[in-house]
Amino acid sequence: MEIVKIINNNIVSALDDENKEIVVMGKGLGFHTKAGQKIPEERIEKIFRLNDESEIGKFKELLEAMPLEHIQTSVEIIDYAKSVLKRRINQNIYITLTDHINFAITRVKDGMEFPNPLLWEVKSFYPSEYLIGEYAIALIRKDLGIEFKTDEAASIALHIVNAEYDSDMSNTCLLYTSPSPRDGATS
């Protein structure tokens, strides 16, 4: 596997055996290296294969502009989600969730947190994904020192739901059988 482009000290793009572009992560992979050099297998921590060439481009741009710790934490959350759910999830989650988490961290640092109006529904209809969201905010607190409100667990859960069903945020539908108690509905 040869380096095509150095994204940062720990992330490079490369070509796999089928000559398809991949993104490779590993400690120091891009440090003091250049395009054309072989990647030592033992230094590879994670390989990202996205099906669409345009998605690879978006992912590389995202990785160039983001702190490594945000990327690593996002990857850990996604790996945890895969292990808990034991089902295939769309690889685009590496783009969507990583971007979301990075932006959410920026918002918290700027004092701009927003409530998630779907919190109750996400907890009710997607309990496994919501628990993964809770795991995610605990991990972010531990690894990055950022304190999110519980609403963020629901936002993260929705990204996971989208990846499970090969959907995007605009197409995510929640089953809604009755008004939530927060709506002030009476029987």
Placement of each model-derived feature along the sequence:
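Short, recurring structural edge motifs at helix starts
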Residues: 78-89, 122, 137-147, 167
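Intrinsic, low-complexity N-terminal interaction/targeting segments
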Residues: 124-134
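Phosphate-rich cofactor/ligand-interacting catalytic cores and adjacent structured alpha/beta frameworks
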Residues: 123, 137, 147-159, 170-175
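Extended intrinsically disordered, low-complexity coil regions enriched in Ser, Thr, Gly, Ala
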Residues: 91, 106-117, 169-172
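Conserved small/polar residues in nucleotide/adenosyl-binding loops
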Residues: 176-183
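A surface-exposed, charged beta-strand/loop segment in the N-terminal or early-internal portion
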Residues: 6-92
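Extracellular/lumenal glycan-associated surfaces
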Residues: 91-105, 151-165
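Short, low-complexity cationic-aromatic patches
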Residues: 85-95, 128-129, 143-154
